[in-house]
């Protein structure tokens, strides 16, 4: 299923120096977001920084949202993950996409202008309506959690 999402280019380098986000393969779920920087940013161990992507989006469909997720290689190889772990973009948001990066590693890491720093994935939304009850219908699991089902 393909859905059109309104994207506004805020930084004129996008489409010129930095490519527009595209799906890498037909099976890709995420589009890479790039750091729209004038100069490289060095992240010291433990440091967080809010980086612009140069893109604004308006999803405009209440049945969709977007999540900003880390790129696996940055986290696994360099210890750089999202500062808020996951970013949620609501359908009515119309501002610039910003990415909070956090260096949880023990070495400084430099982010270059145009470097891919995160990915955005569009997801369906179900808005819940709470139904107040006194008790739940009994299930096999019950209230067991946090390892209740074992390790193997």
Curated annotation (Swiss-Prot):
Substrate binds at residues 71-73, 84, 88-90, 98. It is an enzyme of class 3 (hydrolase). It comes from Photorhabdus laumondii subsp. laumondii (strain DSM 15139 / CIP 105565 / TT01). The lineage of its organism: Bacteria, Pseudomonadati, Pseudomonadota, Gammaproteobacteria, Enterobacterales. Keywords: Hydrolase, Magnesium, Metal-binding, Nucleotide metabolism. This enzyme is involved in nucleotide metabolism: it produces dUMP, the immediate precursor of thymidine nucleotides and it decreases the intracellular concentration of dUTP so that uracil cannot be incorporated into DNA. This is Deoxyuridine 5'-triphosphate nucleotidohydrolase. Its cofactor is Mg(2+). CDD domains: trimeric_dUTPase. Belongs to the dUTPase family. Pathway: Pyrimidine metabolism; dUMP biosynthesis; dUMP from dCTP (dUTP route): step 2/2. NCBIfam families: dut, PRK00601.1. It catalyses: dUTP + H2O = dUMP + diphosphate + H(+). InterPro entries: dUTPase, dUTPase-like, dUTPase-like_sf, dUTPase_trimeric. The keyword Hydrolase applies. Its EC number is 3.6.1.23.
């Amino acid at each position: 299923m393909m859905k059109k999402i309104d994207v506004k280019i805020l930084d004129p380098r996008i489409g010129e120096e930095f490519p527009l986000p595209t799906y890498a393969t037909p099976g890709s779920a995420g589009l890479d977001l790039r750091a729209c920087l004038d100069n490289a940013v060095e992240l010291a161990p433990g440091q967080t920084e809010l980086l612009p992507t140069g893109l604004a989006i308006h999803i405009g469909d209440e049945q969709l949202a977007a999540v900003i997720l880390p790129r696996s290689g940055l986290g696994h190889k360099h210890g750089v993950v999202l500062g808020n772990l996951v970013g949620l973009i609501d359908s009515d948001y119309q501002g610039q996409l910003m990415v909070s990066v956090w260096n949880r590693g023990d070495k400084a890491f430099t982010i270059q202008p145009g470097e891919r720093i995160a990915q955005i994935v569009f997801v369906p939304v179900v808005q819940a309506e709470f139904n107040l009850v006194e008790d739940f219908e009994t299930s096999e699991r019950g209230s067991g959690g946090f390892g209740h089902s074992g390790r193997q």
